[in-house]
Amino acid sequence: MVQLVTAWLAVLIAAVGIAHAETPLERGSYLVNAVMACDGCHTPRGPSGFIMDKRFSGGSQIWDTSAYTVRGSNITPDRETGIGTWSEADIKRSLTDGVRPNGTPLSPQMPFAFYKILTPRDLDAVVAYLRSFAPVRNEVPPPVYKAAMHVELVPGAVKPFTEDALNNPVKRGFYLGTIAHCMECHGRRADGVADYKTALGKGGYLFKGPWGAAVTSNITSHPKRGIGAWTDAEIKRALTQGVSRDGRALQQPMARQNYFSRMTGADLDAIVAWLRTLPPLE
């Protein structure tokens, strides 16, 4: 009798697990909306923030550098102005290799170097979610390329992660921090050059934008210059509420609490565990 009850309990527990299993669409939504923060470039903005009825139809910001002038592309399934005619392979190639179906490159403004690490399951999930958007017609001016573009690859993230690696909290944190492209800002030197070998997490780059100016913080484990003396709760508050240790509100482009507040507790724990491993730099 006891064995029978135990067997039924096992079946019920398994059934609950299946009922709550994450579908590819749910996983893709989580990655895009809680981690990768795709709205930041691909959703137009108005005076009150993102224009959600035109979500992902192309950003209103312009990035004008010595090498390129670009806007965020329309990534809705609109067949004329979006990616509605792209195959799944086309979308995956743009995400991880930075190449359009016609062979033209994407600018480094699209953080494809950080997406090379995506597991095959997660890459499939992101594509499934992108294909689920409502098509929105919005013609975005084509990019203008002025010079050769260099993309710095992220050490340890040049190929897809394995599912087994995600079971390790530190490795999982590195994975999440990579696809959240944290080092796109925090891994730049003061001159703006990405340096993931000697300046990983050091910060110090001055960003200028509609919000004003902000210097990227040191997020290494240095006890004074970095966040080595911060508690886990303080780091999580910065991520999910946009509040620094001293109570100051974090400025753009770091104020990403709208995204990171949607992360699971386990994923936040993993990111904190990974940040603790960054060598102290000053």
Pin down the residues of each PLM region.
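Bacterial N-terminal signal peptides
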Residues: 3-16
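Hydrophobic, ordered structural segments
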Residues: 31, 83, 89, 93-174, ...
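Detector for the c-type heme attachment site
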Residues: 41-47, 96, 111, 131-132, ...
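Extended intrinsically disordered, low-complexity coil regions enriched in Ser, Thr, Gly, Ala
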Residues: 85-90, 100-108, 192-195, 229-234, ...
